[in-house]
Amino acid sequence: GLWETIKNFGKKFTLNILHKLKCKIGGGC
């Protein structure tokens, strides 16, 4: 349903931001 799609998108979005933060703090991916 729509809710699952929204939750999925939110999870991907959050993981993406966390990944970028980790790259900045860690100095590379």
From Swiss-Prot:
Keywords, alphabetical: Amphibian defense peptide, Antibiotic, Antimicrobial, Disulfide bond, Secreted
Predominant cellular place of this UniProt entry's protein: secreted
Tissue and organ expression note: Expressed by the skin glands.
Single biological process term from Gene Ontology: defense response to bacterium
Assigned GO CC terms: extracellular region
Domain of life the protein comes from: Eukaryota
Record field: transmembrane: none
Localization, UniProt: Secreted
Disulfide bridge partners, by residue number: C23-C29
Family: Belongs to the frog skin active peptide (FSAP) family. Brevinin subfamily.
Its job: Antibacterial activity against representative Gram-negative and Gram-positive bacteria.
Protein name: Brevinin-2Tc
Organism, as annotated: Rana temporaria (European common frog)
Upper lineage: Eukaryota, Metazoa, Chordata, Craniata, Vertebrata
